[in-house]
Design a protein with these regions (language model features):
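Local cysteine-cluster metal-coordination motifs and their immediate loop/turn environment
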Residues: 24-37
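C-terminal substrate-binding/active-site "lid" region of AdoMet-derived donor-dependent transferases
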Residues: 145, 149-150
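A generic structural signal for alpha->beta connector loops
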Residues: 96, 129-130, 154
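Hydrophobic pocket-lining residues within nucleotide cofactor-binding pockets
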Residues: 26, 74, 138
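Conserved Radical SAM active-site core
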Residues: 1-3, 11, 17-18, 35-115, ...
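Conserved small/polar residues in nucleotide/adenosyl-binding loops
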Residues: 159-160
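Structural recognition of alpha->loop->beta junctions
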Residues: 114-142
């Protein structure tokens, strides 16, 4: 898996101050996506053990509320497979921090349903490691900049999956 960016103090993508990881790779290609450069699975840098350690160190300060995953698309199966071991490390080291994930996919159709576009052998485990999932593709016609933690009115937030 590659990643496009790590923000070590982000206040736009979840409650409180967060560390944000933008993964690479997305097959959705939403119209007017704010991060279209991350559609390419080869964009950015490889997500290595050293990268994991960098993110884990950034999570250490007490003022950091948690980790947010976005992209690209964290729920692309190859990204899920790469992220599950890392998320276990986050949970072990920082059980008090929460984990948010933004996905253009939908929980019920794409992640939980057999044959869903993002369902794979690690999806249930991946979801169990999240505290908040914000699902639903960005829809330009539903764009609403007044919404908190969403770019359009269609995404749904799920907590404690």
């Amino acid at each position: 898996m590659n990643y496009g960016e790590i923000k070590k103090t982000d206040i736009a993508n979840g409650i409180g101050v967060r560390v944000t990881l933008f993964v690479s790779g997305c097959t959705r290609h939403c119209k007017n996506c704010f991060n279209a450069e991350t559609w390419d699975f080869n964009y950015g840098k490889p997500f290595t053990k050293e990268t994991e350690d960098e993110v884990l160190a950034a999570l250490a300060p007490g003022f950091i509320n948690g980790l947010t995953l976005l992209g690209g698309e964290p729920m692309e199966p190859q990204n899920q497979r790469a992220l599950v071991p890392f998320l276990h490390r986050v949970r072990k080291l920082y059980p008090e921090k929460d984990i948010w994930c933004y996905s253009g996919s939908t929980l019920e159709t794409d992640m939980l349903k057999d044959g869903g576009r993002n369902r794979c052998e690690v999806t249930d485990e991946f979801l169990s490691l999240l505290d908040v999932l914000v699902d639903g593709a960005f829809v330009d016609e539903l764009k609403d900049i007044s919404l908190r933690f969403r770019g359009s009115s269609n995404p749904v937030s799920y907590t404690h999956l």
